[in-house]
Amino acid sequence: MARTDGDTWDLASSVGATATSVAASRAFASRGPDALIDDPYARLLVEAVGLPHFVKVARGEIDFDGDPLFGAQQAINQIVVRTRIFDDFLTDAGQREPQIRQAVILASGLDTRAYRLDWPAGTVVYEIDQPEVIDFKTAVLTDAGVAPAADRRTVGIDLREDWPTALRDAGFDPDRPTAWIAEGLLPYLPPDAQDRLLDSITALSAPGSRLATEHMDAKALTGDWAKAMTERARRHGSDIDLTKLFYNGERRSATEHLGAVGWQTSVQTSNDAYIANGFGPIRDDLLAMIGDSGYLTAWRP
């Protein structure tokens, strides 16, 4: 089903299922003694959602090696790069900038960074997502006896609504610098909503604030990449259709938008990110599909 204004979801449907998919990938990459990332709670959460395909992914019960798009190791490499970039961004922000003691995770889904990262003392981590998603994750981890590693504060609201007011009501201080992450979020917003989100972040960001998100090549959202990933998902038993979940239409890149409103930006291409993490360069056919996509970091002077 195509996206509509005001549509809703849970962790087993629509956009919510993509959060479960990413958590399943983190669980898959966290298995074994030589795992390249460590998300000890991803499998627990995926199993609690209960979608059979993603439970099998999390447990390592699906054989991806014969897939014509990319196999198991390539899937691990991708989620390792993505997870490390956002993990390291939050960790480095707190270590390099002693004044940054608040972080905001937008569309937090099944993100467990508030529980598993080593946060500086006094850090407040705000998680924003739909109320049902927030409540589900909180309940599962609480029932398992898992406690946050920082002062975790949840903000249950759709990002298409007045989330800045809800964030401030939860204790957020816009006069203090903030570390923001928007992982796997922007393609699921209409172009105008993406611009409004970035403007809201800017309005809430004191000097010294930092932001990390993906830099998306617009043609990858509705072109061959989205179609190829949808076909791959179906080959392995998932019915997620990214071509229906991504929004069409001309889109100003987050890099361009943030630069125009005073942020200093830097983009690391996906290929460079792979090489920096010790993996070989991305195959030419995959690069042709993802275009100039990569990872964006920004600093507000």
Curated annotation (Swiss-Prot):
UniProt superkingdom: Bacteria
Q: Which UniProt keywords apply?
A: Methyltransferase, S-adenosyl-L-methionine, Transferase
Q: What is its EC number?
A: 2.1.1.-
Q: What class of enzyme is it?
A: transferase
Q: Which GO terms describe its molecular function?
A: methyltransferase activity
Q: Which cysteine pairs make disulfide bonds?
A: none
Protein family according to the UniProt entry: Belongs to the UPF0677 family.
Q: What is one Gene Ontology biological process annotated in the Swiss-Prot or TrEMBL record?
A: methylation
* A Pfam family: LCM
Name the residues that bind S-adenosyl-L-methionine: D129, D158, L159
InterPro entries tied to this protein: Ppm1/Ppm2/Tcmp, SAM-dependent_MTases_sf, SAM_mthyl_Trfase_ML2640-like
What is the recorded name of this protein? Putative S-adenosyl-L-methionine-dependent methyltransferase Mflv_5024
Any coiled-coil regions, as ranges: none
Q: Does the keyword Methyltransferase apply?
A: yes
Q: What does this protein do?
A: Exhibits S-adenosyl-L-methionine-dependent methyltransferase activity.
